[in-house]
Amino acid sequence: MASTSDFKNGLVLQIEGQLWTIIEFQHVKPGKGPAFVRTKLKNVLSGKVVDKTFNAGVKVETATVDRRDMTYLYHDGTDYIFMDGDTYDQISISEATVGDGARFMLENMAVQVATHEDVPLFVELPVTVELVVQHTDPGLQGDRSTGGTKPATLETGAEINVPLFINTGDKLKVDSRDGNYLGRVNS
């Protein structure tokens, strides 16, 4: 059980038999009336996002989520294969569970797999990943119709927008949560 004062991003709650993770939360103290906590929750299994308000001080059931360090090995049809670094056990996780982060995963990448009662819930990649640009068109200096960015295909097949000065073969830092370009890696 956790109180609303214990809320933090990433906390997994059990509400009506389903697991929800807190994406955003805000403590609100209105001029009139009691304080409350406004949250944005994401269903761990379906990915559905809902807004929910809790009265301040209310106790909410939390779920026990184990996070294990694992290594991404390879993609096999509709599943991704991961290996536990301690036990060398391999587990198979579906595309739906891996989610959007799959487009930034490289073989042998260290990730965290969150499980609840030995069922994989989601895969957390490092916040920043370093990937090589596989293909991008040359940026024309006078071309500003696109706001100074152009599409680039990364070595994983993901496509992101990058500044015009980025070339094929450059190594980039990318935010794995939203796919934003963060900078070039000096090599």
Curated annotation (Swiss-Prot):
One of its GO terms (cellular component) is cytoplasm. Pfam families: EFP, EFP_N, Elong-fact-P_C. Keywords: Cytoplasm, Elongation factor, Protein biosynthesis. One of its GO terms (biological process) is peptide biosynthetic process. It is found in: Cytoplasm. InterPro entries: Elong-fact-P_C, NA-bd_OB-fold, Rib_uL2_dom2, Transl_elong_fac_P/YeiP, Transl_elong_KOW-like, Transl_elong_P/YeiP_cen, Transl_elong_P/YeiP_CS, Transl_elongation_fac_P. The keyword Manganese does not apply. GO terms for molecular function: translation elongation factor activity. SMART domains: EFP, Elong-fact-P_C. It comes from the Bacteria. Pathway: Protein biosynthesis; polypeptide chain elongation. Involved in peptide bond synthesis. Stimulates efficient translation and peptide-bond synthesis on native or reconstituted 70S ribosomes in vitro. Probably functions indirectly by altering the affinity of the ribosome for aminoacyl-tRNA, thus increasing their reactivity as acceptors for peptidyl transferase. Belongs to the elongation factor P family. This is Elongation factor P. The gene is efp.
